[in-house]
């Protein structure tokens, strides 16, 4: 939102019984929750529709890059389009009909809405090494370490696209400290942006080295070598050579065909989006059920939509868990956590969540060559706000103004 001024106050507390830790999108879900709650309160106070109040105060896409009140520069985004897409996807205009139907079944239907912006930067340095092997495979060494994000797939896609080779001929080597000389790790939504960028650079370097070798094989100048559809060809010859051909023909004289590239990026990017949640509360038992969840997430250029959707779904599950279930309870006498294992701890299950209606927006970031933002934390960032606001909306007839988490 176009908030002209901001005042920040921080308080540091030392404790050995923390109730939370740095978590997915750490800090941003809580800030988004506070802002979206305040918008709802303000809208009620001035007698204005909360959705219209949000639209009235959105940052325009024409204002990008936008410097906010605390000095952060939002690189790109179209927040109004996110809102419009999400409300259409969520069948916003037919909510009243669903609410009446729910009431007939003894249910209280509520709806929550949240826009979000989150930041992604992480360790600025990353290195990629690409080597053509004699078994006609490419080995890519990179310093990230996935924990289910599918790096092996999406990283291979980036390299395959630039080098114009089949994706199944690429081997991604991760997490081996005997091989990885430099690596920033996987955190803060940095992996695809930093690794993708440096792998793209290394791929271009590999093509240039291959062109230099191909020029000697084709007996022409480097500028006369064309690379199309995975083949090097002289403009004056019909002979075509693949990367693997060049490696095989020049390995003895020039060594392995390879490229190494190190890169640093210090500018953050700002993934953003909109989330809408609907909940049903049983009017007798007050049992809570999330019935609909809709989200539109601007991740910049999306390399693999299926993986991004998986990241979004997982992030939503974590945010829903924080909003309605999870509580790190501590025994006040011993200081020990009461939940000794996940058997004793309230986390969301598949049955906790409805079918998630998610769409991806792709406003490319100008901060890196591939236009990537991030897709790992966007699901979590608006979840607290949209779930809690939906619950408060459902309980409006009881004049409930606030409710603490976990619900």
Write out the residue ranges for each language-model feature:
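C-terminal catalytic domains of large/alpha subunits in multi-subunit enzymes
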Residues: 1-107, 111-118, 157-407
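Conserved strand-to-helix beginnings and helix N-cap segments that scaffold or border functional pockets
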Residues: 152-153
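Conserved beta-alpha junction segments in alpha/beta enzyme cores
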Residues: 110-142, 149
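Short beta->alpha junction loops/turns
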Residues: 28, 144-145
């Amino acid at each position: 939102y176009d908030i002209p001024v901001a005042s920040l106050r921080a308080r540091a507390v030392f404790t050995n019984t923390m109730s939370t830790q740095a978590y997915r999108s750490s800090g941003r879900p809580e800030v988004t929750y506070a802002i979206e709650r305040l918008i709802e309160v303000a809208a009620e106070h001035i007698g204005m529709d909360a959705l219209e109040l949000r639209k009235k105060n959105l940052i325009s896409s024409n204002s990008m890059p936008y410097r906010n009140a605390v000095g952060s520069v939002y690189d790109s985004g179209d927040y109004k389009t996110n809102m419009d897409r999400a409300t259409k996807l969520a069948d916003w205009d037919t909510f009243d009909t669903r609410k009446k139907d729910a009431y007939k079944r003894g249910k209280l239907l509520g709806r929550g809405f949240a826009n979000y912006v989150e930041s992604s930067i992480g360790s600025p340095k990353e290195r990629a090494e690409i080597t053509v092997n004699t078994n006609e495979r490419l080995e890519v060494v990179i310093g990230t370490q996935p924990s289910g994000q599918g790096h092996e797939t999406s990283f291979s896609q980036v390299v395959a696209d630039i080098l114009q080779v089949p994706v199944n001929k690429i081997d991604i080597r991760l997490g081996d400290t005997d091989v990885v000389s430099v690596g920033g790790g996987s955190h803060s939504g940095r992996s695809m942006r930093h690794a993708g960028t440096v792998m793209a650079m290394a791929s271009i370097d590999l093509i240039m080295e291959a062109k230099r070798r191909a020029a000697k094989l084709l007996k022409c100048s480097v500028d006369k070598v064309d690379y199309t559809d995975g083949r090097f060809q002289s403009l004056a010859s019909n002979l075509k050579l693949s990367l693997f051909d060049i490696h095989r023909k020049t390995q003895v004289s020039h060594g392995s065909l390879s490229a190494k590239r190190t890169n640093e990026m210090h500018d953050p990017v700002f993934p953003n989006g909109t989330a809408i949640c609907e909940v049903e509360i049983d009017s007798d038992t007050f049992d809570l059920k999330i019935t609909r969840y809709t989200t539109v997430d601007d991740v910049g250029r999306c390399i693999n939509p299926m993986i991004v959707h998986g990241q979004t779904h997982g992030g939503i599950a974590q945010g829903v868990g924080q909003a309605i279930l999870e509580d790190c309870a501590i025994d006040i006498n011993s200081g020990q956590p009461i939940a000794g294992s996940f058997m004793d701890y309230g986390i969301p299950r598949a049955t906790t969540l409805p079918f998630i209606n998610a769409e991806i927006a792709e406003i490319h970031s100008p901060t890196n060559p591939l236009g990537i933002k991030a897709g790992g934390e966007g699901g979590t960032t608006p979840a607290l706000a949209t779930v809690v606001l939906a619950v408060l909306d459902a309980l409006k007839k009881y004049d409930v103004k606030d409710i603490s988490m976990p619900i």
